[in-house]
Amino acid sequence: MTLMEDAKKGIVTPSIEAVAKAEGIDAETVRSCVAKGLIAIPKNNRRETLPIGIGKYMSTKINANVGTSRDCIDIDAEVEKAKAAEAFGAHAVMDLSTGGDLNEIRTRILKAVNIPVGTVPIYQAAASQKVVVEMTSDDMFNAVRKHAEQGVDFVTVHAGVNLNSLERLRQSDRIMNVVSRGGSFTLAWMLHNGEDNPFYAEFDYLLEIAKEYDMTLSLGDGMRPGCIADASDRPKFMEFITLGELVKRSRAANVQTFVEGPGHVPLNEIELSVRGMKELCDGAPLYLLGPLVTDIAPGFDHITGAIGGAVAGMYGTDFLCMVTPSEHLALPSLEDIKEGLFVTKLAAHTIDLIKEGPRERAWRQDTAMAYARRDLDWEKQFELAIDGDRARKIRDARKTESDACSMCGELCAVKIVKEAFGEKKAEE
């Protein structure tokens, strides 16, 4: 049985218990939400890994993308990135490799980390042929099965890219058309072969494979906007409608899902996108890359993504895909992964401060930091900081003889008031 089947039968599995304990909430609440598809716990039945809960009442989770490209094939480097991502606090990693021995890369990453691993099987299907459009539907489904057999916990499938959404795209005035790599492969295949997307047309077969391995489906946003000018258009919302229908079919088949969300969205349209997705997809967990809130920040897109992610979290985002400084520019380095992760962790924490479920725990962290700052307890501040090593290096780089920081020294407001209150109490 799948985890969702067990949950529907009232069974609190070890994975559900582990998630409930980690989140500090009642196991029955987690079970009920898994049964309804409001929480996903991506965990292939062929792989032992740390159960991670994504969705309602859960703390906001973070994914880190790693993987080779055809221009940069260094398997050892990508494995190290995956291990570093876990060490820096990622809750999942996705292997997006397109160059080299894809099976070897995936196998090594699966062995290297103890967190859920996701993939995009169509990348392997495309690599099986000289030209993307020459892959067959068998290539596509064989890739999904191969990944499932190897223990992949969740796969992105762009099943919402179909003939209907293609027609909406043709009628639109989009600047960037399609920027999803998997979405572009699917679109090109449909146009070349004159057929509908196999992942959509044969979705029931996809569900059979996913169910056999209890592999979660991440329903990809192949029509996500690639620039601010394309945000909130018909192709995007047409895909949301389709994905919502596929969520219902997945739940009926006892297959867990979460839904991927929009790429570039201005601040004032994020609420529309996120609430729209939640409504159209019946409360399924939402997995967002960003959204990026401006197009003019190459080199700083980890920041534009974190801004968008934090705002999106106000309206229901559950799972943030880390963006690195290399977005739109190059394959990310190990340092890019670290930088992107810490910025995304910051966004996730700001979401948790207001999210039902993790709110109390997040508030305790901030309150503890407030007391440490009041007491000028630097070691405690470094311990509580999202990146304590960085905080320590900055403080140590500009020394002061004061127990305050070098910005204010003896003129520190906290220090002055603390001493003033101390003198007043001594007089009393």
From Swiss-Prot:
GO terms for molecular function: 4 iron, 4 sulfur cluster binding; carbon-carbon lyase activity; zinc ion binding. Its cofactor is [4Fe-4S] cluster. It catalyses: 5-amino-1-(5-phospho-beta-D-ribosyl)imidazole + S-adenosyl-L-methionine = 4-amino-2-methyl-5-(phosphooxymethyl)pyrimidine + CO + 5'-deoxyadenosine + formate + L-methionine + 3 H(+). Pathway: Cofactor biosynthesis; thiamine diphosphate biosynthesis. Its EC number is 4.1.99.17. Gene3D superfamilies: 6.10.250.620, Radical SAM ThiC family, central domain. Pfam families: ThiC_Rad_SAM. Binds 1 [4Fe-4S] cluster per subunit. The cluster is coordinated with 3 cysteines and an exchangeable S-adenosyl-L-methionine. [4Fe-4S] cluster binds at residues 405, 408, 412. Substrate binds at residues 65, 94, 123, 158, 180-182, 221-224, 260, 287. Disulfide bonds: none annotated. Keywords: 4Fe-4S, Iron, Iron-sulfur, Lyase, Metal-binding, S-adenosyl-L-methionine, Thiamine biosynthesis, Zinc. GO terms for biological process: thiamine biosynthetic process; thiamine diphosphate biosynthetic process. Zn(2+) binds at residues 264, 328. InterPro entries: ThiC (IPR037509), ThiC/Bza_core_dom (IPR038521), ThiC/BzaA/B (IPR002817). It comes from the Archaea. The keyword Transcription does not apply. Signal peptide: none annotated. Belongs to the ThiC family. Catalyzes the synthesis of the hydroxymethylpyrimidine phosphate (HMP-P) moiety of thiamine from aminoimidazole ribotide (AIR) in a radical S-adenosyl-L-methionine (SAM)-dependent reaction. This is Phosphomethylpyrimidine synthase 1. It comes from Methanosarcina acetivorans (strain ATCC 35395 / DSM 2834 / JCM 12185 / C2A).
